[in-house]
Swiss-Prot record:
This is Anoctamin-2. Residues 1-365, 456-538, 604-623, 770-801, 929-1003 are cytoplasmic. Homodimer. Component of a presynaptic protein complex recruited to specialized plasma membrane domains of photoreceptors. Interacts with DLG4 by its C-terminal region. The lineage of its organism: Eukaryota, Metazoa, Chordata, Craniata, Vertebrata. Coiled coil: none annotated. It is a multi-pass membrane protein. A motif (DLG4 binding (PDZ)) lies at residues 1001-1003. Keywords: Calcium, Cell membrane, Chloride, Chloride channel, Glycoprotein, Ion channel, Ion transport, Membrane, Transmembrane, Transmembrane helix, Transport. The chain crosses the membrane at residues 366-386, 435-455, 539-559, 583-603, 624-644, 749-769, 802-822, 908-928. Calcium-activated chloride channel (CaCC) which may play a role in olfactory signal transduction. Odorant molecules bind to odor-sensing receptors (OSRs), leading to an increase in calcium entry that activates CaCC current which amplifies the depolarization of the OSR cells, ANO2 seems to be the underlying chloride channel involved in this process. May mediate light perception amplification in retina.
């Protein structure tokens, strides 16, 4: 058999072969049976769809390939590369066709010996009918290609079939030559105009029409003046990008149709679809292209999951830090958005959406709105804190506790080692508690509940506004199409089920010699019986993880109790026991939370995988719910303990509650547990944000990038030096971190939203710290997306999905939690009850004495009395904080009437507070419409403009059709008949136009 020519290299290698650069000719025989050539469809007429017109039985080699485009495995290494291609790094080797998508895979060979003189840098080019170049003959040596192992051979064949199917779909491919023992190969994909037009029509992508841009006007004159004034005042805060400067102008868009090309503003076909749209179209083709050799696997995601390919990604628009003057969207985003130096500027949301797609654009729009809403809450929180600082000297309970003339002798804090003590020694704790436990925090809690409602309502309005500007109305069909693509794991499970059932049915047929008809619908999908083991494992695992979290919290409680007891034995450390124990316990909680966060994230992903959800959207929603549940319990369990349980199960002097045979349960400080709750919140919130942002989001990606760089440099030893000095854009993007979704970004902000809203009554400065963190977080995420991640696929979506429901749930739950914090944890209700029910003069004078009960020290249990007491005077009665009957009462140490009165007042406050805030939240929700009035009016206006524009274009089309007919004899009759034949078509198009407009109206 003659060796194939350089233009006819078979892609399915058989046995080891020896390829000579000079061997073969175009007129030689084709490859044997079983070998196959990847071909590109030749040039087609503009009206034809993309695809291959090759006869399936036609051989790959010989004369039959002259007019077809096949992979060229040899390229002259000495041929100078064009300057334009090197500068752009975004095109095929011909410097004409743009790279819309890249597939990457890693290969390895056995026993490969490179002879001298063989070019080190070569390409395998799928051209478009161009003449192939002769192979380089720089040396006499040949290349001995050793056989691949069975797995590599199978993967190679699957890749070749998949790439062939891509070209059958009309795509054009270019790939590297495997000229090393191992390395990475990049398959560049270009979508020609015919493919773009066909897929854009199938996907119903909205594109600009010839209609000029029209202005989106404000609702009224006052709103218009206010908007103009605000725009003028914030001019220096606006990013200098074209998309942001035209944010009040909108194109009239209509779904693309090849039959209505006259409607669109097509100035140049190569630039009509932007890069994000082109890559989105190619990605849709990749998702639905099948590969029969890989068990009929559907789509690129399945091939990546089976390690056939290593990565698939669209290219970035050049480098972001290039010194050249040429500007691209990536460089513009870096200069005006992804740098810490522009933290004060607004985000260029339209440019973000254009570059990354609607899904990522909505995330940054939500993050920007959330950050801006933190500004008023931060201001109010600072005012509340300053109010506490200003009134600390006027707080009567604090003054009474600090007054040394009030000889309140308190009971020992521990057994044996602790002595009696004066309440005035806790003066600092009482004053610090007043900073956060004052009447202003109640009103701040109500404000924050309404703030959460207003934030969600404004987000719905902003979401609708962005959906209108970004042409997201009527996107339901796209979301339904997304549901049609099954996950690779789901397909694998279905195939395993069908194979198992077919084997069982074959055995039954042999045994019974009968034919049974089963339910075919159940065979090609997973039923609840198939999923039941996964559901059971999920339920048991989640319960175990929650129990593990509670066990760790209990372990920290035991640590606090035992450490406090141990430190109390030493006289030198006895005075700082509470501070030491609290600080170390909070740090332990923080470390455990950070560790469990990473573990729970991996566990949630594993649990979701064994459920085998069918679609990516279902997988993402279930993953979010599991991860949020586990991380919510992990982050807030220690805080809930301090807020609602600490000090509630202590007992009383003479009848304390003990754990582990001798350790007393811990109790709150004299000023209450609110101060400790504040410390717990601040350390966990700040530590979580600082450590996760600086270590996990900055440090870990940099280490991964460094590791990949070292690995690439190690493998690049066999690569041509000129190639390594001038890496192409696909090489640069391949070294970046792969994009894994927005779940970690949303999760971090959702947990922070919980810190801001759930316990704001005890920590009014939480919005301030959240604001400072988010100012950095916006730029950190922006820099990560622009500089450190591969470019994500542009995904269209109309909202933020399940995250909105989680936010709404947290907002409602925060009302209940803050009501209980105010009623139970703080002293707000006891002070209120005392002032209006027990005080003689309507003030808080005598409140401290009212909250302290008496205990007869002679009734202390044997062995618990203070040893070597150095108290100045003999103690007969000591005081402890509780509402109990005195020793001389008929029922000593039982709960007093004041206790039950205050308890009923606490519960009444919870009910009143919850219903009041819920009513106000519903009122705010009702007052703020979900759809802005101006957007609702503009939707109607756009519908009218679109119909008028369509009728005008149809009239112009008919006019052009009638002109040549009028010039010819008998043209009048022909023109009338032609107009009559065109009328139904125009009417049907107008009907589709009206139905499209009705979709806008329903929104």
């Amino acid at each position: 058999m003659a060796t194939p020519g350089p233009r006819d290299i078979p892609l399915l290698p058989g046995s080891p072969r020896r390829l000579s650069p000079q061997a073969g000719s175009r007129g030689g025989q084709g490859p044997k049976h079983g070998q196959q050539c990847l071909k590109m469809p030749g040039p087609r007429a503009p009206g034809l769809q993309g695809g291959s017109n090759r006869d399936p039985g036609q051989p790959c080699g010989g004369e039959s390939t002259r007019s077809s485009s096949v992979i060229n495995n040899y390229l002259d290494a000495n041929e100078p590369v064009s300057l334009e291609a090197r500068l752009s790094r975004m095109h095929f080797h011909d410097s004409q066709r743009k790279v819309d998508y890249v597939l990457a895979y890693h290969y390895r060979k056995r026993g490969v010996h490179l002879a001298q003189g063989f070019p080190g840098h070569s390409l395998a080019i799928v051209s478009n009918g161009e003449t192939g170049k002769e192979p380089h003959a720089g040396g006499p040596g040949d290349i001995e290609l050793g056989p691949l192992d069975a797995l590599e051979e199978e993967r190679k064949e699957q890749r070749e079939e998949f790439e062939h199917n891509l070209m059958e779909a009309g795509l054009e491919l270019e790939k590297d030559l495997e000229n090393k023992s191992q390395g990475s190969i990049f398959v560049r994909i270009h979508a020609p105009w015919q493919v773009l037009a066909r897929e854009a029509e199938f996907l119903k992508i909205k594109v600009p029409t010839k209609k000029e841009m029209y202005e989106i006007k404000a609702g009224g004159s006052i709103a218009k003046k206010f908007s103009a004034a605000l725009q003028k005042l914030s001019s220096h805060l606006q990013p200098r990008v074209p998309e942001h400067s035209n944010n009040k102008m909108k194109n009239l868009s209509y779904p693309f149709s090849r039959e209505k090309m006259y409607l669109y503003n097509i100035q140049e076909k190569d630039t009509f679809f932007d890069n994000a749209t082109r890559s989105r179209i190619v990605h849709e083709i990749l998702k639905r292209t099948a590969c029969s050799r890989a068990n009929n696997t559907m789509g690129i995601n399945s091939l990546i999951a089976n390690n056939i390919y290593e990565a698939a990604y669209p290219l970035h628009d050049g480098e972001y830090d290039s010194p050249e003057d040429d500007m691209n969207d990536r460089k513009l985003l870096y200069q005006e958005w992804a740098r810490y130096g522009v933290f004060y500027k607004f985000q260029p949301i339209d440019l973000i959406r254009k570059y990354f797609g609607e899904k990522i654009g909505l995330y940054f729009a939500w993050l920007g709105l959330y950050t801006s809403f933190l500004i008023p809450s931060s201001v109010i929180g600072v005012i509340v804190f300053l109010y506490g600082c200003a009134t600390i000297e006027e707080d009567i309970p604090s003054r009474e506790m600090c007054d040394q003339q009030n000889a309140f002798t308190m009971c020992p804090l521990c057994d044996k080692s602790c002595d009696y003590w004066n309440l005035s020694s806790a003066c600092g704790t009482a004053q610090a508690s007043h900073l956060f436990d004052n009447p202003a925090t109640v009103f701040f809690s109500i404000f924050m509940a309404l703030w959460a409602t207003m934030f969600l309502e404004n987000w719905k309005r902003l979401q609708m506004r962005l959906g209108y500007f970004w042409d997201l109305t009527g996107i339901e069909e796209e979301e339904e199409r997304a549901q049609e693509h099954s996950r690779p794991e789901y397909e694998t499970k279905v195939r395993e089920k069908m194979l198992k059932e077919s084997n069982q049915s074959a055995v039954q047929k042999l045994e019974t010699n009968t034919t049974e008809c089963g339910d075919e619908d159940d065979e090609d999908k997973l039923t609840w019986k198939d999923r039941f083991p996964g559901y059971l494992m999920n339920f048991a695992s989640i319960l175990f993880m929650i129990a593990l979290t509670f066990s760790i919290v209990f372990g920290v409680i035991v640590y606090r109790i035992t450490t406090a007891a141990a430190l109390s034995l030493n006289k030198a450390t006895r005075s700082n026991v509470r501070v030491t124990v609290t600080a170390t316990a909070v740090i332990i909680n923080l470390v455990v939370i950070l560790i469990l966060d990473e573990i729970y994230g991996a566990v949630a992903k594993w649990l979701t995988k064994i459920e085998v959800p069918k679609t990516e959207q279902t997988f993402e929603e279930r993953l979010i719910l599991k991860a949020f549940l586990l991380k919510f319990v992990n982050a807030y369990s220690p805080i809930f303990y301090v807020a609602f349980f600490k000090g509630r199960f202590v007992g009383r002097p003479g009848s304390y509650v003990y754990v582990f045979d001798g350790y007393r349960m811990e109790e709150c400080a004299p000023g209450g547990c609110l101060m400790e709750l504040c410390i717990q919140l601040s350390i966990i919130m700040l530590g979580k944000q600082l450590i996760q942002n600086n270590i996990f989001e900055i440090g870990v990606p940099k280490l991964k990038k460094l590791f990949r760089k070292l690995k690439d440099e190690t493998e690049a030893g066999e690569t041509d030096s000129a190639h390594s000095k001038h890496p192409e854009q696909w090489d640069l993007d391949y070294s970046l971190e792969p994009y894994t979704g927005l779940t970690p970004e949303y999760m971090e902000m959702i947990i922070q939203f919980g810190f801001v809203t759930l316990f704001v009554a005890s920590f009014p400065l939480a919005p301030v710290f959240a604001l400072l963190n988010n100012v950095i977080e916006v730029r950190l995420d922006a820099k990560k997306f622009v500089t450190e991640l591969r470019r994500p696929d542009a995904v269209r979506t109309k909202d933020i999905g399940i995250w909105f429901d989680i936010l709404s749930g947290i907002g409602k739950f925060s009302v209940i939690s803050n009501a209980f914090v105010i009623a139970i944890t703080s002293d707000f209700i006891p002070r209120l009850v005392y002032q209006y029910s027990y005080s003689h003069n309507g003030t808080l004078h005598g409140f401290v004495n009212h909250t302290l009960s008496f205990f007869n020290v002679s009734q202390l249990k044997e062995g618990t009395q203070p040893e070597n007491s150095q108290f100045d005077q003999e103690v007969q009665f000591c005081r402890f904080k509780d509402y109990r009957e005195p020793p001389w009462a008929p029922n000593p140490y039982e709960f007093s009437k004041q206790y039950w009165f205050i308890l009923s007042a606490r519960l009444a406050f919870v009910i009143i507070f919850q219903n009041l805030v819920m009513f106000l939240s519903v009122l705010v929700d009702w007052m703020i419409p979900d759809i802005p009035t101006d957007i609702s009016d503009q939707i109607k206006k756009e519908k009218s403009l679109l119909v008028d524009f369509f009728l005008k274009e149809e009239h112009e089309k008919l006019k052009l059709m009638d002109e040549p007919a009028l010039r010819s004899p008998g043209g009048g009759d022909r023109s009338r008949s032609r107009a009559a034949s065109s009328a139904p078509s125009g009417q049907s198009q107008l009907g589709s136009m009206m139905s499209s407009g009705s979709q806008h109206t329903n929104v």
